[in-house]
């Protein structure tokens, strides 16, 4: 699952991975993470609640037992998944367990989005919410994105928490605002697990 901008974002902030990669929520992912990272990664594992063509391990990352190896993955990708989890704090803990110290975690979650059950739809997130759920990570490279291909707005960390009413503004050819809008809006950020 996810948007076309997920792959644009990850190519910018993490162009190559030579270690192990875990993709959480891989069943219906059309973003192409596997095709992009598998040629250079030593290992690529897709996980989901149910079987699918890109699912290597079927598991529930909110269950008491986590079948994935701890402190193992160089990169964990979790896009458009956490809004479907009734207890995201448990999932966040399980995801953090499998990222090796110094490893990366790429999270993309909706901030403004329509209801979409898979199997249900519980939450919307801000950057601060993700930082709170994953306290063992140093977060970097914040961005807003929409479902429109290439529509990514990079923001500085010091802009977090300020009024973001101008986060997406359509501009004319000279860069002057012509329309303020909030389309479906995702937040994207990558963090490095503290040693």
Give the ranges of each region predicted by the language model.
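Conserved long hydrophobic alpha-helices within structured protein cores
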Residues: 13-27, 140-143
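Class I SAM-dependent methyltransferase Rossmann-like catalytic core
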Residues: 1-15
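N-terminal capping/interface segment
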Residues: 8-10, 75-77, 184-186
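Short, surface-exposed alpha-helical recognition segments that flank or form part
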Residues: 1, 83, 179
């Amino acid at each position: 699952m996810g948007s076309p901008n997920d792959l644009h974002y990850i190519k910018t902030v993490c162009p190559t991975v030579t270690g192990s990669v875990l993709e959480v929520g891989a069943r219906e992912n059309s973003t192409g993470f596997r095709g992009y990272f598998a040629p250079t990664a030593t290992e690529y594992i897709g996980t989901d609640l149910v079987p699918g063509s890109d699912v290597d391990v079927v598991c529930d990352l909110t269950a008491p037992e986590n079948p994935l190896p701890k402190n193992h993955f160089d990169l964990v990708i979790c896009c458009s998944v956490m809004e479907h989890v009734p207890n995201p704090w448990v999932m966040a803990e399980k995801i953090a367990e499998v990222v090796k110290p110094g490893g990366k975690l790429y999270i993309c979650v909706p901030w403004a989005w329509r209801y979409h059950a898979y199997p249900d739809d519980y939450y919307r997130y801000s950057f601060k919410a993700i930082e709170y759920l994953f306290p063992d990570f140093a977060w970097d490279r914040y961005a807003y994105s929409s479902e429109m291909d290439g529509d990514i707005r990079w923001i500085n960390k010091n802009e977090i928490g300020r009024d973001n009413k101008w986060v997406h503004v359509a501009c004319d050819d000279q860069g002057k605002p012509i329309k303020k809008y909030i389309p479906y809006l995702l937040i994207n950020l990558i963090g490095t697990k503290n040693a």
